[in-house]
Amino acid sequence: MKVLLGLLLGYSVLIHAYELPDLPRTQHPPKSELSYWCTYVPQCDFCWDCQDGICKNKITGSRFINSNHSIVNCRVFRDSKTQSCLYEISSKMPNHFNMECSHPRPYTGNEIFMKPWGGG
């Protein structure tokens, strides 16, 4: 019984150690969190550095795409109370994507339309 109680207590401490603070709605998430946000919704504009119609991924630095309608304006938000992460995605059909911050899952809405630089 003491072992079980110890495990449960340890687990709850571990969960609280990974809680993240609130993040108000923003189009510019902290640089330290870009890899998190861009992993799950890679077509958000804050994930790309675009110049002269060619876009370079800010995280990998190696994936280049043509600047086109597949890169969308996004705002992100995190609620520390519920530990939910929310994307507001502005495109022709705006939508919301909500997930548990600790159990993220990719959004693949319009990533299939991203065209690699060079037409490939």
Curated annotation (Swiss-Prot):
Transmembrane segments: none
Assigned keywords, A-Z: Signal
InterPro entries: ASFV_fam_110 (IPR004848)
Signal peptide stretch: 1-17
Role according to the record: Plays a role in virus cell tropism, and may be required for efficient virus replication in macrophages.
Family assignment from sequence similarity: Belongs to the asfivirus MGF 110 family.
Official protein name in the record: Protein MGF 110-14L
Source lineage: Viruses, Varidnaviria, Bamfordvirae, Nucleocytoviricota, Pokkesviricetes
